[in-house]
């Protein structure tokens, strides 16, 4: 990337850890300094549709830092399981220890636990690290029908892990297996009422909460098992020992879908990591899976569908705190930006060869422009709705007024009186530019106002910083005072403040809105160039006074 003095001056100004206000995946504003964290302890799925691959995709797409401890390596795809290579219990514990030792985590989910010894290892770790939100997905049968566990595993799961569990998430076949292992009969599940009875039985095994998933049994509007082509629903039941909560969603006639159980449990864990209540986490998790099924990508050869874990991802091509770098190097922005910050008007100004009438004309128009620049900040204050933001807009107005006083003083030193400034007629370029700013601010939001003013605010510092490094600059030249005014700590502080506002705003915007604002930035940049070009053409080009060094 070519040298830009702005990057150097703003380095370390936008440490993401300092941004305390963030949006969670549901759009809730949350105050926090760090990413939420969750750990998945499960088997792998080389095809990416289930297991830890699905877990980590889900956590990432929901804004959670995901860690994993692999229990088994599974050669499978949506069509079935080919083979399983089990990890040693000691190695599973070692993975968990490595994760938690470095990144503390209390929201943990489990998936496929390949042996009784691995279940015991996970239970030991749960006690050792006090997993307060342990979500257990009792993976027993693959979507394809392949068995993934033995009877011994079920016994140890019931006896050692479920009593430590915050939420267990069996589907109906898994719930039947869990209950049968303890000598409890919950077969013949044909209605929502039967599901409630089943959930209550599973609750007796020790977990604090049971989420019985109803995806294997669509029901009609009476809550009865049905396969008719009618308005079928899927009902998931959450039981806390006292109350049943029903979560109803439309039944998607997609056939078999690979990885829904893994994805739901990891989604619930993710929302718990965001500190949502359990009922919220369950509802949000169901909604996430519903969307992932709805947008199932038709890319696999197996008849079983796969999930689209990325339905909620919105890709932006910049990291938090680095948007200014991104926009100034954006291929659509660069041509207009380069023309603006490298204009021959500024080069001749720094060299001292710019005709005085050209500079005087610029000073007059800039005075009129500052009036409208202050009006724009006032408009921003009107559009804000919090005291800190209103105050910040007011401070920007004050800064422009202070800049105006310096401007009047500078004008006087170049033979332009205050009366000259007040009686000056606004040029078409100044009128077009300033009214574009005000019109954009009136018609759009605060973000648009920040972007339409940004080329002026940022550009003047960038130009001054560039000119200070140019070999052709005349430090004793007649216009060095102008360069000094915009290459000073006071002005840089204003630039930093404006850039920080933009950096914080863009984190809340969609990619589409960001692109719209970039286009506003480009147009405002072109108006800035026109602001140089008007006096340059009138007093340099038309008079054949161009400096050959810049031709």
Swiss-Prot record:
4-amino-5-hydroxymethyl-2-methylpyrimidine binds at residue 76. It is found in: Cytoplasm. GO terms for molecular function: ATP binding; hydroxymethylpyrimidine kinase activity; phosphomethylpyrimidine kinase activity. Its EC number is 2.7.1.49, 2.7.4.7. Keywords: ATP-binding, Cytoplasm, Kinase, Nucleotide-binding, Thiamine biosynthesis, Transferase. Gene3D superfamilies: 3.40.1190.20, Heme oxygenase-like (1.20.910.10). GO terms for biological process: thiamine biosynthetic process; thiamine diphosphate biosynthetic process. Pfam families: Phos_pyr_kin (PF08543), TENA_THI-4 (PF03070). Pathway: Cofactor biosynthesis; thiamine diphosphate biosynthesis; 4-amino-2-methyl-5-diphosphomethylpyrimidine from 5-amino-1-(5-phospho-D-ribosyl)imidazole: step 2/3; Cofactor biosynthesis; thiamine diphosphate biosynthesis; 4-amino-2-methyl-5-diphosphomethylpyrimidine from 5-amino-1-(5-phospho-D-ribosyl)imidazole: step 3/3. It catalyses: 4-amino-5-hydroxymethyl-2-methylpyrimidine + ATP = 4-amino-2-methyl-5-(phosphooxymethyl)pyrimidine + ADP + H(+); 4-amino-2-methyl-5-(phosphooxymethyl)pyrimidine + ATP = 4-amino-2-methyl-5-(diphosphooxymethyl)pyrimidine + ADP. GO terms for cellular component: cytosol. In the N-terminal section; belongs to the ThiD family. NCBIfam families: HMP-P_kinase. Catalyzes the phosphorylation of hydroxymethylpyrimidine phosphate (HMP-P) to HMP-PP, and of HMP to HMP-P. This is Putative hydroxymethylpyrimidine/phosphomethylpyrimidine kinase 2. It comes from Schizosaccharomyces pombe (strain 972 / ATCC 24843) (Fission yeast). The lineage of its organism: Eukaryota, Fungi, Dikarya, Ascomycota, Taphrinomycotina.
């Amino acid at each position: 990337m070519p040298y830009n003095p702005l990057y150097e001056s703003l380095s370390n100004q936008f440490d993401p850890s300092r941004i305390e206000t963030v949006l969670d995946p549901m759009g809730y504003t949350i105050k926090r300094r760090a990413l939420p964290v969750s750990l998945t302890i499960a088997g792998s799925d080389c095809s990416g549709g289930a297991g830890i691959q699905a877990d980590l995709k889900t956590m990432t797409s929901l804004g959670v830092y995901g860690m994993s401890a692999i229990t088994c390596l599974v050669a499978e795809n949506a069509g079935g399981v080919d083979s399983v290579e089990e990890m040693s219990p000691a190695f599973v514990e070692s993975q968990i220890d490595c994760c938690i030792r470095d990144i503390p985590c209390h929201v943990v989910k489990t998936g496929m636990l390949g042996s009784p010894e691995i279940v015991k290892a996970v239970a030991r770790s749960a006690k050792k690290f006090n997993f307060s939100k342990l979500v257990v997905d009792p993976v027993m049968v693959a979507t394809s029908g392949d068995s993934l566990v033995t009877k011994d595993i079920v016994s140890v799961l019931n006896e050692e892990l479920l009593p430590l569990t915050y939420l267990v998430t069996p589907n109906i076949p898994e719930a039947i297996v869990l209950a049968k292992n303890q000598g409890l009969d919950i077969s013949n599940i044909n209605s929502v009422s039967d599901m409630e009875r089943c959930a209550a039985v599973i609750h007796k095994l020790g977990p604090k909460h049971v989420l019985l998933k109803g995806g294997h049994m669509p029901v009609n509007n009476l809550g009865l098992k049905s396969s008719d082509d009618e308005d079928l629903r899927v009902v998931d039941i959450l039981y806390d020992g006292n109350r049943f909560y029903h979560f109803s969603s439309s039944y998607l006639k997609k056939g078999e879908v690979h990885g829904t159980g893994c994805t739901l449990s990891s989604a619930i864990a993710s929302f718990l990591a965001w500190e949502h209540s359990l009922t919220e986490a369950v509802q949000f998790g169901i909604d996430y899976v519903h969307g992932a099924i709805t947008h199932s990508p038709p890319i696999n050869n197996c008849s079983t569908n796969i999930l689209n874990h990325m339905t909620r991802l919105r890709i932006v091509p910049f990291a938090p705190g680095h948007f200014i770098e991104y926009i100034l190097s954006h291929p659509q922005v660069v041509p207009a930006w380069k023309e603006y910050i490298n204009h021959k008007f500024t080069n001749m100004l720094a060299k001292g060869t710019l005709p005085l009438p050209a500079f005087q004309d610029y000073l007059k128009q800039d005075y009129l422009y500052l009036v409208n620049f202050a009006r724009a900040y006032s408009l921003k204050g009107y559009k804000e709705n919090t005291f800190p933001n209103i105050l910040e807009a007011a401070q920007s107005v004050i800064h422009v007024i202070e800049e105006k006083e310096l401007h009047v003083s500078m004008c006087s030193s170049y033979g332009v009186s205050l009366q000259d400034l007040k009686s000056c007629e606004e040029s078409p370029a100044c009128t077009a530019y300033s009214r574009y700013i005000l019109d954009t601010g009136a018609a759009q939001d605060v973000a648009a106002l920040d972007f339409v003013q940004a080329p002026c605010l940022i550009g003047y510092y960038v130009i001054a910083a560039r000119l200070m490094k140019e070999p052709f600059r005349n430090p004793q030249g007649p216009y060095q005072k102008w360069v000094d005014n915009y290459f000073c700590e006071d002005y840089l502080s204003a630039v930093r403040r404006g850039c920080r506002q933009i950096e914080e705003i863009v984190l809340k915007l969609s990619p589409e809105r960001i692109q719209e604002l970039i286009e506003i930035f480009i147009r405002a940049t072109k108006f800035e160039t026109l602001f140089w070009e008007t006096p340059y053409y009138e007093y340099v080009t038309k008079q054949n006074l161009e400096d050959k060094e810049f031709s």
